[in-house]
């Protein structure tokens, strides 16, 4: 079967990266908005206690979903590289192997999350008044992990093939259903936090079904065929060697944030609720930037498979500038219109005041995460994940934990807690040094004049 996938190895890079990223941004923003609808509906119609219950689970939700998103990014790189190299049989094997692996991981996370929810929430120091609602919300949410794993698999495969529009359509359909179910379960059925969790998992299974149906009907090289559903050992090793470190990188952020959440929980309930409301901005900014990182990884991987040196490194720099600039604009808007933003989630003035503290500090910090995250995506696009993972562990996990137990413990102000983000991003910008070495090593593996630029030693 000839590949009918979108070619990312020819044409004007700036235009291509922008056009590739925009549907991904819309997809990610819609996902964030639908997640925000959970918080908004709970905050407006179920009260501050239910809002705090949902907010208390946010770090654990990020831990589980972050690992699955990382799995997807590894799948994206492997599939994109084979598409770029025009190795259709390898694409088939990678796609079908990845689907089975994703399902297995999703089921494992579901089981572990469901069983250990009370213990994990207790470790975070969740307030007793919020515990029952938090346990109910998180356990129900965990039942949707297999569906989320499948959707992330499909999103990764379609993006690797250059199609970023279909996931947007699927998520839009599932998201509208999610909002309607949120309102029904909370307002009509009075299920509070459990209601929005139930709405979420129903919409997740709908989006997973849509993406699988699309791949089954696809006329391109990424078509799913029942007869090919098996784990091919070599492809499994390739996928896991990138997916597990990528998943761990995302999970490590969440693990470090567990300690940060414990720090937030040491303040009163108003601060916890304000933090929960303001933290929605994190997802909004990060997920818009993440669309560009996916573009960076996809373009670099396809062009590496095709042996296009200049396009590989240019993809990185264009993505870096693009993500930094967008973060600056979004940060400015959040700081200027912060009170209006927080008003979506709470009508309690004291909660909004607490949330503004986080928005102001994080608004000055978001853009600097591009140096780390875009470089992580670039390393992954070149097939290297181990060293970036070590750097992230040291800079974003170990350092943040040390900060919580030293700087924050000494000052014990919410400002001293939030400032650790920008400092840790500065440290993990050392990823850029790692990329230079990885790039030089990988370029030596390509034929010397494949794109008209002689390889450098």
Predicted regions and their residues:
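Hydrophobic transmembrane alpha-helices of multi-pass small-molecule transporters
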Residues: 63-66, 178-182, 208-212, 284-287, ...
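Short alpha-helical transmembrane segments in multi-pass integral membrane proteins
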Residues: 1-21, 79-146, 188-244, 300-365, ...
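N-terminal transmembrane alpha-helices
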Residues: 8-45, 59-74, 78, 103-110, ...
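Interfacial/gating helices of multi-pass transporter permease domains
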Residues: 42-62, 128-133, 193-194, 198, ...
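Transmembrane helical elements of multi-pass membrane transporters/channels
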Residues: 19-38, 140, 151, 174, ...
